[in-house]
Amino acid sequence: MKQIFIWLIKGYRMFISPLYPPTCRFRPTCSMYAIEAIERFGVFRGGWMAIRRILRCHPFHPGGYDPVPELGEHCCHHDSGNKG
């Protein structure tokens, strides 16, 4: 299942993305981020991370360097405040 989603993203990069000017505000690009997140975390968690990233890719966000977190790193921006 993971390979199907990666294949679809690569198809987008090859056939659809070249039709439009580059507009991604992040490095790595959102499509590369999606591929890496799915490879590292699987379809559901990696896909969710990719969707959140794409939703941040707009003119009002500064963008910049935003790599896929390593396994074990805090990746989903949950509140990790002290509970005590």
Swiss-Prot record:
Q: Topology in the membrane?
A: Peripheral membrane protein
A Pfam family recorded for this sequence: YidD
Q: Does the keyword Metal-binding apply?
A: no
Compartment list: Cell inner membrane
Example of a GO cellular component annotation carried by this entry: plasma membrane
Report the main location listed first in the record: membrane
Q: Which superkingdom does the taxonomy of this entry point to?
A: Bacteria
Keywords from UniProt, A to Z, are: Cell inner membrane, Cell membrane, Membrane
User: Which residue pairs form cystines in this protein?
Assistant: none
UniProt cross-references to InterPro entries, sorted A to Z:
Membr_insert_effic_factor_YidD
Please explain the role this protein plays, according to its UniProt record: Could be involved in insertion of integral membrane proteins into the membrane.
**Record family assignment:** Belongs to the UPF0161 family.
* Protein's recorded name: Putative membrane protein insertion efficiency factor
State the species of origin. Nostoc sp. (strain PCC 7120 / SAG 25.82 / UTEX 2576)
